[in-house]
């Protein structure tokens, strides 16, 4: 069988409300997520012994191959699908690591989609979702990468949302920010709630096909992990300040637990212009104009 290929798009948290910490230590959240054109690539050589090779511009930061979520996802799949055909994966790593982009989770979800195709499973097969959930909290939402509201620990998903395409610039200052450290810095004790407004249940009808209305809606919905992430990595604040000063930026936020931040713009042209200017100012940063869907 021929080499199989799947995209693993970056997951962008347009909003992130931390509702509280459970007794088991996990955090309940509500987040409106979208997916970018930028991402990693996952390849599968069918029916070879299960293995993983990582290559690409950010491969060196991805950690040991044996710890990669791609292999964890494949093993979770095999546990739930007796006699499953597997293979050798090649992960072309393009996204920054520990960046708040859900890169590892999206890679794992792409691997599960490839294995589903190889074994004749539909994407809505409950075994696929179970394998995703066993692999990591952000993997289920990445299985079908379309804009959604995610709740719980990431395992309660809405139907796909009618989000208009949003022009954006993604910026990472090359500082890795481990998710666990940011949640620790948030400082919630088990069983405690985080004060704040309730997250909306979806997008208002006024945002249908209207990117400007989406920006206005998002402006009142912050990312609750920004303060602890900024305390751990002040460079994030510098990136946000540069974006906020740009006339093209309509909304500036941090994605996930950082350190990637994004600016929404009016068009792909203004996003590309802003990205070029930022790269000229900060040639060492990772900067990508993209579309969020």
UniProtKB/Swiss-Prot annotation:
SUPFAM superfamilies: GHMP Kinase, C-terminal domain, Ribosomal protein S5 domain 2-like. The keyword Kinase applies. It comes from the Bacteria. It is an enzyme of class 2 (transferase). Pathway: Isoprenoid biosynthesis; isopentenyl diphosphate biosynthesis via DXP pathway; isopentenyl diphosphate from 1-deoxy-D-xylulose 5-phosphate: step 3/6. It holds the Pfam family GHMP_kinases_C. ATP binds at residues 96-106. GO terms for biological process: isopentenyl diphosphate biosynthetic process, methylerythritol 4-phosphate pathway; terpenoid biosynthetic process. Its EC number is 2.7.1.148. It catalyses: 4-CDP-2-C-methyl-D-erythritol + ATP = 4-CDP-2-C-methyl-D-erythritol 2-phosphate + ADP + H(+). Belongs to the GHMP kinase family. IspE subfamily. This is 4-diphosphocytidyl-2-C-methyl-D-erythritol kinase.
